[in-house]
Amino acid sequence: KRFQWLIIISFIVITLLGYYPTNNFPPVKQSMVVAEAHEQKAEILAASFQKPLILPHPGYLSTRFSNWHPGVDIATGLGMPIHPIIDGEITETARDFWGLGNYVVVSHENGFKSTYAHMGKVFVKTGQKVTSENLLGEVGLTGHTSGPHTHLEITHNGNYIDPLTILPKIPNMPKIASATK
């Protein structure tokens, strides 16, 4: 009797969490069409810049863009200089103790903005015009972070976009060789 109640409560919890079993296979054709549309949108977004975009600094991709992580993390050494991905104007410099740490927001042409977070030092001020040659600051360990990296967010007209769709290729974090003997 106790086991029966456990099963019933489990089904209720699973149903409330939104899980509904299905026998359908994923719509492959629809997925391919959606992926192709995303590719075309990325090409259009990248073409809206007059100059090519650059990476803020050398490094490795340590965390990808997702619904829960609206940017990418580029792992690198502590103190690495951070450059804007393209020319723009500094619209915000701030410190968020729990989340982004020290961060800078740069407004670019055509409704784009880029945010650079977890900075150790910030070298720019709000209202300052910057080019990709200028230094925004240095990579640090401020805010909620587990190691030195830049959290880079890009928005277009207020909507988050995956930076990997318009930036040059960022190499994946190398796998650590296991010590086997």
Give the positions of each predicted feature:
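Solvent-exposed coil/turn segments that connect beta secondary-structure elements
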Residues: 66-67, 77-79, 87, 95-96, ...
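A beta-hairpin/wing motif
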Residues: 147-150
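Short hydrophobic beta/alpha edge segments that flank linear recognition/processing sites
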Residues: 74, 102-106, 130-145
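Zn2+-dependent peptidoglycan hydrolase active-site motif and core
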Residues: 85-123
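Acidic, glycine-anchored pre-beta loop/turn
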Residues: 122-130, 134, 158
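Acidic, glycine-rich catalytic/binding loops that coordinate metals and/or anionic ligands
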Residues: 2-11, 153-181
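Short, conserved secondary-structure segments in the cores of folded domains
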Residues: 78-81, 120, 126
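Surface-exposed, glycine-biased beta-strand/turn segments
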Residues: 2, 11-101, 132
